[in-house]
Amino acid sequence: MAFGEVHIPFWEESEHIRRTCSVTGLYFWTRDKNRKTSGDTHEDPYTFIGSPIIDGFPMRGKELKDSMRSSFLDYFSENSHSKVDPYPVIARWRDDIHLTIASIADFQPHVTSGRVPPPANPLCISQPCIRLTDVAAVGRSGRHLTTFEMMAHHAFNRPNDGEIVYWIDQCVRFCDDMLVNTFGINPIEITYVENPWSGGGNAGAALEVIVGGLELATLVFMNLEEHEDGDIIIKGLTYREMDLQIIDTGYGLERFCWAAAGTPTIYEAIYPESVSWLKE
């Protein structure tokens, strides 16, 4: 499934245009008719440092994270999603990973395969995650963490059975509406970059949501499963279409906090006491 083949009415209604990034060659959607890059390249600086792009969050540290998390979950709760408690960070229901690395990992493989129903449908969650693959980048990039929370909204569709909760168009509408009307982000600053996603045996078309040079979220439209007889190749692996169509999103809690704080790095926004202690 390619975005060029999928009709998304929201793009037309909101006057988005599809462009090709002059740096990466990836397609992206924007309201800015003069934009030439996707927003996530070496030519795109962080524009929010010293000038926050999310308003209304003057606090720092735990208070900031708690407030940001509540705003996200409340938005989706008010839009017919059930709040689900986070899963453990030790992925004891998985035999392929030890740690919970994303919110969708909570539901792989049992729910995503269709063998087990989801705890709610649609649902929203803020899942603590641990990613040791990012250790080398911590402290160098100013944005990487090994422990973080992935805020998310998920929906599990069974189109063959006529069970559709919502799919691509509504997912993008939720994301854009929340960014603009809940967090006060200037809509012309938002870009949606087309870049397929894969992980945990599943894959699908995806949109990376970029604001101010920072990737705030990824919207994945999961409709593929890894299979040796598959005829779709993504990142060197073969996939085939599966019965479920799954909305798999991930919004970085700490990155939202950083965009709201406008501090030099993400660490001053979420660990102000630790940074102050280290500076002493």
How would you label these PLM feature ranges?
Residues 1-12:
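Short, intrinsically disordered terminal segments enriched in charged and Pro/Gly residues
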Residues 31-49:
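Cysteine-rich micro-motifs
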